[in-house]
């Protein structure tokens, strides 16, 4: 008799979860913190509620759109992940391991047994089917994935250029990570730790800076505004294209166009327009290892022995110079 109000309590909890899943998750499956690891945590929180309902025979009390939203979140995460199951370390994200992610996919596959892509990742390709597309855009969340394969030999770029987000997000609109033939060639700087005192916060704030991401700054300052708008997304054809625009600073707008040419190489065009004055700085976070460079030719070339190398060639107005700066990568 002391649990006579249990149905009302249960309904209240389910109503709160259903409300939150609609508040926190955009219609493209992206979680509103725009942080891959927080996104992953949110998936599992919502899934645990389903697991408890299943254990007690109350699954039917969850509306279908609750399940549909979780499934779309899983597919979002699968798309932005790299072939080795790791994730871009945008915002406050930490690097996941393949072992951890296979375990997650196995649990998700039990919830969504008809989803062949989830089954594929759960079984490491032994069962299921990969998505029938390569590149994929999530326009509301502002995540865009160019790829020419789902395999380890893929060329894959993940671009982050979304709306204004929340505490776990960083001022990094336009940044990207690039995977090539088994290696992440433009790793994000990461986040260090969530919070602390003194030197800890100094380190966290260093990792949050716009200037330590693969994007453009004015006078190396953090972006004033982080509200990117997608002007064009064309994920098919010989020249796949993304054009995104952000009102980065007062009186200075940044338009970044990314072209994936012949499924082979990328051309990035950055245009800054406005009356603001100062130094425009284009930042690239290079991977750990030996790098050959030519300041006269504005060129970088990685020197990895395994052959997973890339050449970065920059072009710009007369007077443009190149400077090496220290970089750190927190995973």
Regions found by a protein language model. Give the residues of each.
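Secondary-structure boundary elements
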Residues: 3-5, 19, 55, 151-153, ...
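Short, acidic Gly/Pro/Ser/Thr-rich loop/turn segments
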Residues: 153, 166, 194, 223-225
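Cytochrome P450 core scaffold surrounding the K-helix E-X-X-R motif
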Residues: 186-189, 195-197
């Amino acid at each position: 008799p002391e649990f006579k109000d249990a149905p009302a309590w249960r309904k209240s909890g389910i109503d709160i979860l259903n409300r939150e899943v609609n508040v926190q998750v955009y219609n493209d499956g992206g979680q509103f913190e725009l942080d891959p690891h927080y996104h992953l945590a949110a998936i599992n929180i919502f899934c645990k509620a389903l697991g408890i309902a299943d254990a007690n025979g109350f699954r039917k009390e969850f509306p279908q759109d609750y399940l549909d939203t979780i499934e779309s979140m899983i597919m979002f995460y699968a798309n932005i992940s790299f072939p080795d199951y790791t994730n871009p370390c945008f915002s406050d994200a930490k690097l996941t391991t393949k072992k951890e992610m296979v375990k997650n996919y196995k649990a998700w596959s039990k919830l969504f047994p008809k989803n062949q892509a989830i089954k594929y990742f759960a079984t490491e390709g032994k069962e299921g089917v990969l998505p029938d597309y390569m590149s994929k855009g999530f326009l509301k969340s502002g995540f865009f994935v160019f790829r020419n394969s789902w395999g380890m030999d893929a060329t894959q770029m993940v671009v982050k250029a979304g709306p204004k987000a929340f505490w776990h997000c960083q001022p990094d609109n336009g940044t990207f990570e690039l995977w090539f033939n088994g290696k992440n060639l433009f790793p994000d700087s990461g986040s260090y730790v969530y919070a602390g005192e003194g030197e800890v916060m100094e380190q966290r704030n260093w990792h949050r800076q716009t200037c330590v991401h693969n994007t453009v700054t004015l006078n190396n300052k953090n972006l004033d505004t982080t509200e990117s708008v997608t002007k064009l997304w064309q994920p098919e054809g010989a020249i796949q294209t993304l054009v995104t625009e952000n009102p980065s600073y007062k009186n200075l707008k940044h338009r970044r166009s990314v072209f994936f040419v012949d499924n082979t190489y990328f051309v990035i065009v950055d245009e800054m327009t406005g009356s603001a004055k100062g130094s425009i700085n284009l930042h690239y976070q290079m991977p750990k290892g030996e790098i050959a460079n030519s300041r006269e030719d504005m060129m970088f070339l990685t020197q990895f022995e395994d052959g997973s190398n890339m050449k970065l060639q920059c072009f710009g107005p007369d007077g443009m110079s190149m400077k090496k700066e220290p970089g750190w990568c927190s995973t």
